[in-house]
Amino acid sequence: RKESSAASDVYKRQEFDQYLKRLGYVFKNESKEIGGYAILKNKKIMLIMDVGDSPSNNFSKFYQSGALSFEIISNGKKLITNSGYFTDKKNKLNKFSKSTALQSTLSIEDHSSCDYKKLDKFSLIVKKGVRIIKRNTIFEDNYWKISGSHDGYLKKFKTIHEREVEFYPEQMKFVGFDKLQRKNNSKNIKFDIRFHLNPDAKVMKTQDNKSILVELEDEGWKFNCESYDINIDNGLYLGIKNSYRENQ
């Protein structure tokens, strides 16, 4: 299990509400799902997870391989984020922005959960998509949970990725759990779990490599992982039209 007390800007909460209202979306069921995303929120926190299948090939030009990736927004500031979409198709960053490595989720052996193929000189579409096998959402005053699993690594690695993210509002604490369900455990596989941060966040790792302290404006959060060491790497935030910023 990985624990995070974490803080969080793709949409500010009010902007996101207006966006949903403009599109005519109204939550009418307990799944809290819109367009393949589970969205849980209160006045301070918003938790968003990608729990939808990849689109069919003809509608996948803008798809990014982010199955079970999630974002956290706290008081209108995004902490945990995906890295954004680079719109200039002639730039190699466009292809890069589609990869699973740029989403806040798990990847295996540096592969994305989807395969892509060329539609024309510059456009890529999904060749082999990803299917969400199961998903579940719990939204109560003092307990939230979004969970799901996908088959994006089933063919290559005979592996199902399962993820759940819990939130305890009274404690302002997130708890996450990732599991690789494998049909054949005889061969070790390398996996990475990435959490991309707001480029304005300041981070510091503790000496035991088990915790990271995150400062974002007037909020401070602590990310813990007891089972594995945590590394801080430099990355790119592409959520700026045809531009980017460095993040971690």
What positions do the PLM features span?
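CBM-like, beta-strand-rich accessory domains located in the C-terminal region of large
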Residues: 1, 5-8, 85-248
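Carbohydrate-active enzyme catalytic cores, enriched for enzymes
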Residues: 1-81
